[in-house]
């Protein structure tokens, strides 16, 4: 009799009613997205629920593959599911569909650009001045996003001083197909630069409107295809090229790059003011050359002073997304076409770039959710 009872309990869950989809959703309503501050059920993240006896399987579809807390969310989901009476095993698969930038309509917005129809988010990486490792930051962020599973493109908008082709290794030069250009790929990332169409060792001598025309072609006549993020490496200044981009493409937001010292902040503030005037959200600040760790003493040395990025972020009410240390290997990798996040993923600078990429993706997701009405209000301040 005891044997029959045991068998019956194994088959029926000890007399408990079977686990239902409603039970699963009720349990997962306790799991909140840390950025959107809503539960993952009401946000529509929970998909493909499958219940087989005491095993529950499902997908949690996030708003970006670059979400740095996806493993934490997965663990929370599994823990909540195992609290349901009758659930012995929880199988949670984390997926992602990058949300599309849908800015609120304004008169200043450009018309829809067919060449960019498949691009979900366009992010400007800018500083207003040269020499702050802006291009290095753009390259490493692009690869950090790609490593997380995103489809990424990289546009070198510095017509007068293009450096991206030196910093990455693309498989072939850009090819012409009719009226459009097919960009080459550099280890999975689509890349375009004026240096691909000229002798890289010679100066590009163009008047401002002509330089703007080159960038307009890159935005309207390049087959970017389906991308989660198009990273635009901005040139120094606040002139024709910057205005052309804002008139041709709808930017999701801008990442501001600075070094710690005040002489950098003078020009960087002008770039921030430009984006505010153009009604482009500033997603945050990244500080490069923040410190150097000495091999001998293992201490941080603030060679270019300290706190500039933090002051800038506080001044404009945005987030300081990260501080990148000085590492000679970054410069070597840039010269040899080997991005630091690929060649030294465990290095402190690579981890910092990866963290910034994750924070940037989350900021874009928050902004997109707000524009779509998922959120009533939000703050771009990162804590």
Question: Residue spans of the language-model regions?
Answer:
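N-proximal, solvent-exposed amphipathic alpha-helical segments enriched in charged/polar residues
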Residues: 8-47
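Extreme N-terminal, non-catalytic leader segments
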Residues: 42-45, 50, 63, 70-126, ...
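Short, aliphatic-rich beta-strand segments
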Residues: 49-63, 192
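Conserved catalytic-core segment of NTP-binding enzymes
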Residues: 77, 228-229, 235-336
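Walker A/P-loop phosphate-binding motif and the immediately C-terminal alpha-helix
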Residues: 121-159, 272
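Phosphate-binding loop that captures ATP/GTP phosphates
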Residues: 145-208, 212-219, 310
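Phosphate-binding/switch loop-helix module in NTP-utilizing enzymes
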Residues: 198-245, 264
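C-terminal boundary of histidine-terminating zinc-finger modules
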Residues: 336-347
């Amino acid at each position: 009799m005891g044997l029959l009872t045991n068998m019956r309990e194994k088959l029926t869950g000890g007399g408990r009613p079977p686990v239902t989809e409603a039970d699963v959703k009720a349990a997962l309503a306790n799991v909140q997205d840390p950025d959107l501050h809503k539960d993952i059920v009401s946000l529509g993240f929970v998909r493909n629920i499958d219940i087989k006896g005491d095993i529950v399987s499902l997908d949690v579809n996030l708003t970006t593959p670059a979400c740095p807390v996806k493993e934490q969310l997965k663990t929370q989901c599994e823990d909540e599911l195992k609290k349901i009476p009758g659930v012995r095993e929880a199988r949670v698969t984390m997926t992602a569909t990058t949300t599309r930038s849908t800015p609120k309509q304004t008169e200043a917005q450009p018309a829809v650009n067919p060449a960019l129809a498949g691009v979900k988010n366009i992010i400007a990486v800018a500083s207003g001045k040269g020499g702050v490792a802006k291009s290095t930051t753009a390259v490493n962020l692009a690869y950090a996003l790609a490593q997380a599973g995103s489809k990424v493109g990289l546009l070198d908008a510095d017509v007068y001083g293009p450096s991206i082709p030196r910093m990455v290794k693309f498989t072939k030069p850009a090819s012409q197909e009719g009226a459009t250009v097919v960009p080459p790929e550099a280890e999975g990332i689509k890349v375009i630069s004026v240096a691909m169409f000229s002798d890289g060792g010679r100066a590009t001598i163009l008047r401002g409107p002509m330089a703007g025309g080159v960038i307009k072609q890159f935005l309207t006549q390049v087959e970017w295809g389906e991308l989660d993020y198009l990273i635009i490496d901005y040139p120094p200044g606040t002139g024709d090229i910057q205005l052309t981009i804002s008139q041709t493409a709808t930017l999701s937001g801008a990442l501001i790059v600075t070094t710690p010292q005040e002489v950098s902040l003078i020009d960087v503030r002008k770039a921030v003011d430009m984006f505010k005037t153009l009604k482009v959200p500033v997603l945050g600040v990244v500080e490069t050359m923040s410190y150097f760790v000495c091999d001998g003493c293992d201490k941080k040395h603030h060679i270019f002073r300290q706190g500039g990025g933090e002051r800038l972020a506080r001044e404009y009410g945005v987030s300081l997304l990260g501080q990148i240390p000085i590492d000679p290997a970054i410069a070597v990798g840039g010269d040899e076409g080997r991005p630091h996040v690929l060649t030294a993923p465990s290095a402190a600078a690579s981890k910092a770039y990866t963290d910034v990429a994750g924070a940037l993706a989350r900021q874009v997701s928050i902004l997109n959710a707000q524009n779509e009405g998922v959120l009533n209000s939000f703050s771009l301040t990162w804590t």
